[in-house]
Amino acid sequence: MLQEAGETIATLVKGFSVTFRNMLRKPVTENYPEEPVQFQPRYRGIHVLQRDENGLEKCVGCFLCAAACPARCIYIEAAENSADQRISAGERYASVYNIDYSRCIFCGYCVEACPTDAITHGHGFEMATSNINAMIYRKEKLLEKAPRK
């Protein structure tokens, strides 16, 4: 019985030593959303469709990003630019551009595959929802963060 009491005290001292050692360290918990989150330079967040310096969409509807995506979460429909209304600088543009974030693995292959740098990773990460259909981001939402001239 005396041996059991000694083992119990030794175990308590060992456990409390870990607690007391870490009590004086700086906490690693982020106070989000009260304090802004600091992102690493190469953070892969929610995608952003870019515009060029004239305010036209950079996406030319080439489908390379959709072909490179291992999760098959990118859906594109291309249309031809007309002479009176130009959407992008190329001959075609993406009339429909959807990303299904319930499937996206944020691998970055779509960004690497894009020849016009039309799609990039932003720093957005807030997409929690109870509606699965809200996880499909359409072209308009992906263009929101891109500056318009």
Task: Label every PLM stretch briefly.
Residues 1-103, 109-112, 116-149:
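Non-ligating segments of multi-cofactor redox enzymes
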